[in-house]
């Protein structure tokens, strides 16, 4: 299943949190639709700001929008003028007070959303896709990624029959839940049709194997030592032998 499921949703609560943090009652659907409108508006409005992720937090009277970007200066503007404009525009969508926080991404080469978006924009500029992908992979590995995989699908080079090509370097352990794997999908609109770009980036493991098992053993109703790899404890319990014996 690790090869099929979205790596981000498969690790929610372990590696990464939710993008929408709020509780809804009977108006749950309305709030969810409002979040969708906010994200769609910001992704269009900040198309040149290399936005990776938009996190929305809500209270009764305040909506907090956290924008993760590699180019915070484009969003903030001179003297914070652009942020003030964004607040007023989002107020009209939410009818509430809006607070915007900017989070700068220090290494955009290791962010799957930014990498996928950059590849898609270069494909729209008619740059050879193999060259674009190889440059992106080399940059990610140079910045410390343990592995990166890029898949491009569509009418590559304008051929009549669509196909998919995959390029990979390093390791992408999709079945390892403690592995910090980022994933993103982007689309490039070209003259010959739509090209899909998928990017997986492994940034390493957040927990060691033993720490991971110990931390999440209680959630599965396991004994702390049963999941720690202590074979002697398992053997004693299987044979009905007490520790002092």
From Swiss-Prot:
Which keywords fit this entry according to its UniProt record? Ribonucleoprotein, Ribosomal protein, RNA-binding, rRNA-binding
Pfam families recorded: KH_2, Ribosomal_S3_C
What GO annotations for molecular function exist for this entry?
mRNA binding; rRNA binding; structural constituent of ribosome
Q: Which sequence ranges are marked TM in the entry?
A: none
PROSITE patterns in the record: KH_TYPE_2 (PS50823), RIBOSOMAL_S3 (PS00548)
- Biased composition of type Basic residues is found at 233-245
InterPro entries cross-referenced by the UniProt entry: KH_dom, KH_dom-like_a/b, KH_dom_type_2, KH_sf_prok-type, Ribosomal_S3_C_sf, Ribosomal_uS3_bac-typ, Ribosomal_uS3_C, Ribosomal_uS3_CS
Q: Which GO terms describe its biological process?
A: translation
Domain (KH type-2): give its ranges. 38-106
A GO cellular component entry from the record: cytosolic small ribosomal subunit
Q: Where is this region: Disordered?
A: 225-245
Q: Which protein family is named in the record?
A: Belongs to the universal ribosomal protein uS3 family.
**Quaternary structure (record):** Part of the 30S ribosomal subunit. Forms a tight complex with proteins S10 and S14.
- What is the stated purpose of this protein? Binds the lower part of the 30S subunit head. Binds mRNA in the 70S ribosome, positioning it for translation.
Name assigned to this protein: Small ribosomal subunit protein uS3
Q: Which organism is it from?
A: Azobacteroides pseudotrichonymphae genomovar. CFP2
